[in-house]
Amino acid sequence: MPRKKQNERGTNKQEIINIETKSSTFQEKQRQSKTDQISTVWRKEQKKQELKVHTELHPQHRTGFNEDKGTDPWLTTWRIITVILGTSCIILVTKVGFLIPNLFSRGEKRSRELSLLDSLCLKNNDSFCDLCSHDWIAFGNNFYLFFRGTKTWAESKSACEELNSYLLDIDSRAELENLLLFEINGWILFKTDAINRSLRKNYIKIHQTLFNDSEKKNHSCHYLSGNQFSAGDCSSKKAYTCEFNLQ
């Protein structure tokens, strides 16, 4: 009996020791877990502080980059601007390519006109100086001078004669087509030869107005308005165009 009791006591002591050992091991694990948690939190805080300091020392420029969509709005805007500018440059270069030849052709044409007038002034006497002192416009060998001031038909005719020229006389289809570009409005010579009859029939509208016998005498002068011939009162004042021809 005494030996049995001793064995029981030994067993109880061993169990107590095992329980105490397990308890102390569990407490150590808890302490270690808490220590690890504290260490992890500390490391996170340290990283945050380091990142904050780095951001303050090296501020990043805003680029407008959208991480969610993976696109850069600024880049898209610049691409659109680049396309617009490129298209505008192409259009501008194309226009310049068309304009430069026209400018050169106009300059050459004007140079030929001036050389014709210069040669005319040098070869002739002082009576041709009036032709050289005005800005005449040339179509082939025909030169024209447009006046916006108004005169009667007789005054217009006399003014052109003073410039050693004559009142506008349209005698060909080519001449008419050139003059229609300028939308001439004023007194003209109105001949009844075959050429003028053909022009009036095919290319020019004649404004017909009924006059009595007394009015016909005063309305025997004609003027051109756009592409229309009209009979007008010779005493009324209108614009006019002078013309001369180099044969």
Swiss-Prot record:
Domain C-type lectin: start-end pairs: 139-243
Entry keywords, A to Z: Cell membrane, Disulfide bond, Glycoprotein, Lectin, Membrane, Receptor, Signal-anchor, Transmembrane, Transmembrane helix
GO BP terms in the entry: positive regulation of natural killer cell mediated cytotoxicity; stimulatory C-type lectin receptor signaling pathway
Membrane topology recorded in Swiss-Prot or TrEMBL: Single-pass type II membrane protein
PROSITE patterns: C_TYPE_LECTIN_2 (PS50041)
Cross-referenced SMART domains: CLECT (SM00034)
GO cellular component: external side of plasma membrane; plasma membrane
Cytoplasmic side: 1-79
PANTHER family: C-TYPE LECTIN PROTEINS, KILLER CELL LECTIN-LIKE RECEPTOR SUBFAMILY I MEMBER 2
Protein name: Killer cell lectin-like receptor subfamily I member 2
